Design a protein with these regions (language model features):
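Short, low-complexity, charged amphipathic interaction modules
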Residues: 240-283
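Collagenous Gly-X-Y triple-helix signature in extracellular proteins
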Residues: 1-243
Length: 287
């Protein structure tokens, strides 16, 4: 018999359940209804339990995703150098919007229990994984169960429990009007600057231009209690050591990338000098 799923009222109720030590009563696939300024009611689905480590020190977490995207929007608008939008998650309009008016649209008690987490996303411009700290984010291709091949699909996080079986039907979403919809992922198409991964109405992976339209299927992580002044928060710039180490490694890699062209030029010049000296020495030996 199929397990009956439960619908909870608000993120604050989930936080209370965690706080009371009753995490076991929550199940993957359960839904949560929240009030929001984008729509009277938004529906969220539990896709992971203790799958994400919160940067504020929260010991137990529940990861949820929006299953009735309320708006159709672009991933990133056109700008200088990227007339059709850019597929980089970190500077995208989508990420800024999620951390801005979308986050602000929750009731205060629900917003207070959303905790910051660290997310990995491939950067086509830098040709490597970059890390961001977000309270609201989009899911990645690997997190929804698309197989990683280190080419078209990069490792941007383990599949959440809800998507582990690879069932396309679980990726099918309907918008707030009840219509099947495309929805954005944060994963770029790795070989260009404008293509972003999307999931189609059939649940299959696809891609679209960053300036095009898609459903905003936000995700977030709920902690055990409201963030208070005595807890570490991302906003206070006190991220975990691992995150800081990643940032340092990223900065070093950026510096190396900047230096490499000059080093290559110096090596080429040195090779030409050696070649010229060798040629002159050979000429003198013949004399």
């Amino acid at each position: 018999m199929e397990e009956i799923k439960t619908t909870y009222q608000g993120f604050a109720e989930i936080a209370r359940i965690i706080r009371e030590g009753k995490l076991g009563q929550l199940h993957i696939g359960d839904t949560i209804s929240t009030r929001h300024t984008l729509r009277d009611r938004l529906m969220w689905r539990i896709i992971g339990i203790n799958a994400d480590a919160a940067l504020d020190g929260t010991p137990e977490t529940v990861t949820v995703m929006l299953c009735n995207p309320p708006i159709w929007c672009s991933f990133d608008g056109g700008r200088k150098g990227f007339p059709f939008g850019c597929n980089e998650w970190e500077p995208s309009d989508m990420r800024a919007r999620l951390q801005g008016d979308v986050l602000d649209g929750f009731d205060a008690e629900d917003r207070a229990v959303i905790v910051p987490v660290r997310k990995a996303t491939y950067s086509p411009q830098n040709e490597r994984i970059r890390y961001t700290s977000d309270k609201l984010f989009l899911l990645s291709a690997s997190e929804i169960g698309i197989a990683v091949d280190d080419d078209a699909i990069r490792d941007e996080g383990k599949p959440y429990a809800y998507f582990e079986d690879g069932d396309d039907e679980k990726r099918c979403l309907t918008d707030a009007d009840g219509d099947p919809c495309y929805w954005w992922l944060r994963s770029p198409r790795p070989w260009d600057a404008g293509g972003v991964r999307v999931v189609g109405p059939s649940g299959a992976l696809g891609s679209g231009g960053a300036a095009g339209g898609g459903g905003l299927a936000a995700a977030c992580v709920i902690g055990d209690r409201p963030i208070s002044a005595d807890r570490r928060t991302d906003d206070e710039d006190t991220e975990d050591i691992q995150h800081l180490q990643d940032e340092m490694a990223q900065a070093i890699a950026d510096a190396v990338q900047d230096v490499l062209p000059a080093l290559r030029r110096a090596v080429n010049i040195a090779a030409r000098i050696v070649q010229q000296i060798s040629g002159e020495a050979e000429g003198q030996s013949h004399e």
